[in-house]
Amino acid sequence: FLGGLIGPLMSLIPGLLK
């Protein structure tokens, strides 16, 4: 479960912050 979320989150969170 978490493994599937970590991937997208690592790509989305930095993208939103920038």
From Swiss-Prot:
It comes from the Eukaryota. Expressed by the venom gland. The keyword Secreted applies. It is found in: Secreted. The keyword Nucleus does not apply. The modification Lysine amide is found at residue 18. GO terms for cellular component: extracellular region. Signal peptide: none annotated. Keywords: Amidation, Antimicrobial, Secreted. May have antimicrobial properties, like most ant linear peptides. This is U1-poneritoxin-Da2a.
